[in-house]
């Protein structure tokens, strides 16, 4: 059947380049939905994000994802919204930017550092105590698994009008993620507790520069974590 799958998302905004979440995520999906209606294409899958919400104090990324969901829900389309947690993996093998590669490049290899010394990787914490540093978790899921679910959902009429959350089989903390990436790339790291409000303030000044590892939006979402249980979903589709 004819269908539209809207995957466009913008992890980090650069307004001076015209790259904003409102433009590419919200307005883009809204426009494509209207085009689909005009062309008589009824089936529409929207890739949203786990944690999408209208909170004005939240990230612009999650706000835009929420607005996209509302636009699709208000359409006449046979829609399904899919909300994955953090994705990893490059299925085409073309070394395009992806979660783990970007962490390795922008955090573990941002500045020259002797390989024989443990690299001080930031482990963010909120509040006054550093004992919870880096414990926020993600249900990371491979992009190939998400693609497989999209294919299954496309022909599953029971998912029409539904919102589906997608996450990996286990929760992985920030500290575990960084240590795993370092191990896979032959590096040695130690997790250095870093006050979130300090890093967040610095990002407010520097996130306009592409070389800076993360913007305030990304930090807001990271510190909240992104966790769900999709065991039954994977079981249903035999993935």
Give names to the regions the model predicted.
Residues 22-29, 45, 65, 139:
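Short alpha-helix in the Rossmann-fold core of NAD(P)-dependent oxidoreductases
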Residues 38-43, 75-77:
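A short helix->loop->beta-strand "cap" motif at the edges of active sites that frequently abuts
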Residues 1-39, 50-55, 154:
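NAD(P)H-binding glycine-rich loop region in Rossmannoid oxidoreductase-like domains
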Residues 147-214, 228-239:
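Mid/C-terminal beta-alpha module of Rossmann-like enzyme folds, strongest
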Residues 54-172, 179:
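Oxidoreductase cofactor-interface core, primarily capturing Rossmann-like NAD(P)-dependent enzymes
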């Amino acid at each position: 059947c004819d269908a539209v799958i809207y995957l466009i998302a913008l992890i980090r905004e650069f307004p001076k380049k015209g790259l904003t979440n409102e433009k590419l995520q919200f307005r883009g999906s809204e426009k494509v939905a209207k085009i689909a209606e005009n062309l008589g294409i009824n089936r529409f899958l929207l890739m949203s994000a786990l944690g999408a919400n209208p909170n004005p104090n939240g990230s612009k990324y999650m706000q835009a994802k929420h607005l996209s969901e509302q636009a699709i829900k208000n359409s006449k389309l046979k829609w399904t919204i899919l909300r994955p947690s953090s994705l990893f993996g490059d299925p085409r093998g073309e070394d395009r930017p992806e979660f783990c590669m970007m962490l390795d490049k922008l955090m573990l290899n941002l500045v020259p550092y002797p390989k024989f010394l443990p690299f001080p990787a930031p482990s963010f914490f909120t509040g006054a105590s550093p004992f919870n540093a880096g414990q926020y978790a993600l249900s990371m899921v491979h992009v190939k698994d998400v693609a497989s679910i999209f294919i299954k959902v496309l022909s599953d009429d029971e998912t029409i009008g539904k919102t589906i959350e997608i996450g990996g089989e286990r929760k992985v903390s920030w500290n575990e993620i960084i240590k795993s990436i370092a191990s896979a790339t032959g590096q040695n790291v130690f997790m250095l507790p870093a006050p979130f409000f300090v890093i967040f303030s610095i990002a407010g000044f520097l996130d306009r520069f592409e070389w800076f590892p993360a913007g305030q939006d990304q930090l807001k979402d990271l510190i909240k974590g992104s966790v769900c249980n999709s065991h039954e979903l994977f079981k249903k589709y035999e993935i």
